[in-house]
């Protein structure tokens, strides 16, 4: 099962593990999280709580921070899985922060206050704001000033800030990404810092969704303590931890992997965005992730949810391309679609773009 060069044997893997996670793996994970952020932030291994993926991490944090019928504010468009992860078992509500293309879907103070007031008017207690940075489905990062404003808002409202940074190692224009950890590093007030919690996973940056490895990193002692007590429901196997601790501790490998992965993502992103542009289709400027945010609003016969889904159905059945309609992400504008481009060959991408070009040519003839 394992080699003889210091790797753990079957017995060591099979016995009960530390529910907090193996120290070696938490140390390796902390170092890797620092590495993908360019060393701009420091992570304490003792503040890392392991979970079976980011899904479990987000749900666990929701259980800790909120009670049934409380709410989290989430900017739109957002990852459709949040409707499951944050709501199904916790009984917590999602109140959308409506963002639009007028400022590239960045969160504005007005939209934030409006969402908070909507919840208050409905007698719903708001317990926090949850963002994804970089964003899924936008493929864009949250500006530093927006992060600072978000934290100020959370302090004023006495609520929490959760930053899901699952794509933080897949930023192909690294200078554009600011982790909330960088904001916290410059804050001395513990009462402010302890409102911030980060979710991370190896599913996207290392392409290991089947390994089910996620983390909660909290600046709150109480949240760390509570998350550890509850983490027995979402443990990561000893074998997985040992293997990944060894892999992540190989700094030469991780540095090369991050560099090559970012370069490949950048090239792939530029290929698809340029290809779509030649077909007359514009995309939101992106800098991270495995997808682009494509605007087909000009093709809608009706500027409605049904109109968007009708176009999606045509693309699915005629072009045999499965893209995600913006309505599934609760987008406030109709006609936006998420296009995933990473998990396919160059040849497959070329075929997809060819079909899109032919589709657009047919549309122009009508």
For each feature predicted by the language model, list its residue ranges:
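N-terminal small-domain helix-loop-helix segment of the aminotransferase-like
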Residues: 1-53, 60, 110-111, 248-253, ...
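Conserved PLP-anchoring active-site segment centered on the Schiff-base-forming lysine
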Residues: 64-83
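Conserved glycine-rich beta-strand-loop-beta hairpin in the small C-terminal domain of fold type I
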Residues: 261-273, 283-298, 333
């Amino acid at each position: 099962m394992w080699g003889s060069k210091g790797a753990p044997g079957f017995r060591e893997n099979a016995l009960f593990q530390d529910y907090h996670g193996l120290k070696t793996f938490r140390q390796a994970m902390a170092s890797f999280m620092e590495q993908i952020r360019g060393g701009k932030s420091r992570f304490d291994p003792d503040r890392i709580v392991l979970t079976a993926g980011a899904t479990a991490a987000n749900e666990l944090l929701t259980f800790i921070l909120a009670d049934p019928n409380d709410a989290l504010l989430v900017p739109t468009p957002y990852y459709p899985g949040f409707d499951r992860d944050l709501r199904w078992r916790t009984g917590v509500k999602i109140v959308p922060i409506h963002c639009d293309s007028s400022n590239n879907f960045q969160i504005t103070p007005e939209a934030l206050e409006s969402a908070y007031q909507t919840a208050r008017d409905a007698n719903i207690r708001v317990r926090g704001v949850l963002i994804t940075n970089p964003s899924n489905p936008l493929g864009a990062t949250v500006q530093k000033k927006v992060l600072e404003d978000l934290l100020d808002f959370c302090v004023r409202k006495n609520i929490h800030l959760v930053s899901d940074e699952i794509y933080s190692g897949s930023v192909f224009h690294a200078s554009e990404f600011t982790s909330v950890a960088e904001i916290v590093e410059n804050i001395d007030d513990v009462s402010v810092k302890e409102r911030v919690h980060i979710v991370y996973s190896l599913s996207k940056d290392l392409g290991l969704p089947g390994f089910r490895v996620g983390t909660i990193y909290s600046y709150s002692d109480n949240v760390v303590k509570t998350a550890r007590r509850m983490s027995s429901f979402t443990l990561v196997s000893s074998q997985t931890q040992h293997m990944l601790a060894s892999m992540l501790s190989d700094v030469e490998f991780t540095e090369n992997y991050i560099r090559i992965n970012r370069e490949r993502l950048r090239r792939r992103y530029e290929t698809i965005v340029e290809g779509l542009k030649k077909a007359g289709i514009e995309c939101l400027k992106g800098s991270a992730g495995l997808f682009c945010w494509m605007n087909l609003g000009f093709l809608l016969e009706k500027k409605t949810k049904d109109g968007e889904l009708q176009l999606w159905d045509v693309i699915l059945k005629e072009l045999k391309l499965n893209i995600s309609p913006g309505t599934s992400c609760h987008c406030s504008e109709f006609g936006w679609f998420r296009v995933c481009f990473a998990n396919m060959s160059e040849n497959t991408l070329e075929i997809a773009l060819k079909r899109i070009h032919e589709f657009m040519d047919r549309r122009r003839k009508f």
